[in-house]
């Protein structure tokens, strides 16, 4: 009886380990926030859990890879949408978008910068896609950092898969 319980417990433990490993490979992963990716919500050194193989939504943070380096940015627009930033105002489908999540960083930047400085340089989907698109194509996303002075996002890399 004791031997059977011991074997059952070993099998259950091994099964739990295998399930945990499979979840880590296919469903969840962890990511450490680095200095360039920090913002009002994510700080340098924070360890976050990310879900794999899901379709991100507007305002979600996503981890993506470009040239074997990982980056964290926020989803601003997705397939079928147009996006323009002009004079520090973001427009999605020609509608002004409120971005309260960047206000503190933006205000800090503007109070320490020369008059007339822009927190977000002007762009649109045509400039980001090098003239190829006016709206975001299927399967692509416009990703921006909350700290818009850090241009390691769609403005540098183009639209992200």
Per-segment meaning from a language model:
Residues 21-39:
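Aromatic-capped interface at the extracytoplasmic side
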